[in-house]
Amino acid sequence: MDKSPFELRKQKIIDTNMNFLSNYEFDEEPLVSIIILTRNGLHHLKRLFTDFDSKTNYSNYEIIVVDNASNDGSVEYLKSLNLPITLIENKENVSFSKGNNDAAKIANGEYLLLLNNDIEPTYGWLNEMVGCMLNNDDVGSVGAKLIFPYYEDMQSQGKSFTIQHAGVKFREERTPYVYGPYHSNMFSTLIFSNEVNHQKEVISNTAACLLVPKEIYENLGGLDENYFYGYEDIDFAFKLHKNNYKSIFNPFALLFHHESATRVEDEDEKNRLNYENIMYFYNKWGDYLFKEIFIDKINQNHFITDKKIDISIISKNDEFISKLVKDLNNRDFNVKLIPNLNNLAIGEDCDILISNNKDYDVDKIISRLNIIKVLISNEDDSRYDICLEKSNDYANELMNIIEEKYL
């Protein structure tokens, strides 16, 4: 039977990726414990475990499946497989963090591989991830390139065979939560472009497919169990980063991700849990994230964010302001001049607000919560973070104060 255009497209992606595989050879393969959570995901499990062993290109692994009270025959199916599976049968739907932590406690492997049940592997994925881990220094995690599968429904069809995950970055949002994580290059059809087809350090990988040394996982306390299906992988990545471990994105470990198979089904409950996850994350990591993003922007590393420093100046233009704008632009910052004192809508992109007028109602601005507020004045004003009088070298003096105070 002839293959459909969609099957041919999928096969072309798989065949193309084969050309990039390292096919690592190991003197001794370390044991990898593959941890999978599932809840009524029989159809996902059948896809995941089709030719599972032959696709790994790696022989030394065990599988630990955490079943969260399935009633669709998942347990019976898992028990029928001729694979090294250990089954944890829960009587309730435990969180992603708790399920993985419970499995990690009984894992025999030197490495833990967190894997969603809605993943469809392609050849060589596990060999690639382990090889990447062993051939880089100070690695805390290795993530994979995840691709959306083909979707038949019109609403989702546009994202078919596009990138779902190629590392995580952050961007500004006009919410109290200050910054939002996103998958870089998401929905791109350029699956093998140079930007996403080389190993690189990222701030975070998704835990949909994540390799971690068990010792590091345990030393950092595993996944934080205060989350429920959201932000726990980013939280763990920040623990790695804070402890000077690298998170590496390996694009040659390529898998299809059919998305969100073991989450809460009630929409209102999902929204509530998502809100609680966000609030907990930013209460825990908000200050650290602000500092790291600010450093990233000033140094233009494009590691955590792709954005530049954004500065809004509340003032009419004059000789002093004109020079200040020029000096800040020379630092390759985005600078916007706002001459209207009644304009309070600063926007979510603004990092630094500079006011040349003490009558500006800075307490009522519409912006992110954590922007730095500067008043051009020789008098203190408690509404502002920095008060600095005019000088010929104002831009440099201001940035020195900001770097000393915040970085």
Q: Model-predicted segments: where are they?
A:
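A recurrent flexible, glycine/aromatic-enriched loop bordering the glycosyltransferase active site
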Residues: 97-98, 171-215, 219
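Conserved donor NDP-sugar-binding/catalytic core segment of glycosyltransferases
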Residues: 119-176
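A conserved acidic beta->alpha catalytic loop
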Residues: 67-76, 92
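Short, acidic, metal-binding catalytic loop of nucleotide-sugar glycosyltransferases
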Residues: 50-60
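A short, conserved alpha-helix in the catalytic core of glycosyltransferases
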Residues: 124-129, 195-221, 226-254
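Short aromatic/hydrophobic "clamp" motif used to bind/position activated sugar donors
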Residues: 112
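Glycine-rich, basic loop-to-helix element that forms the pyrophosphate-binding segment
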Residues: 90-107, 123-124
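Non-catalytic membrane-proximal stalk/linker segments that position and tether the catalytic domains
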Residues: 1-31, 191-192, 265-310, 391-407
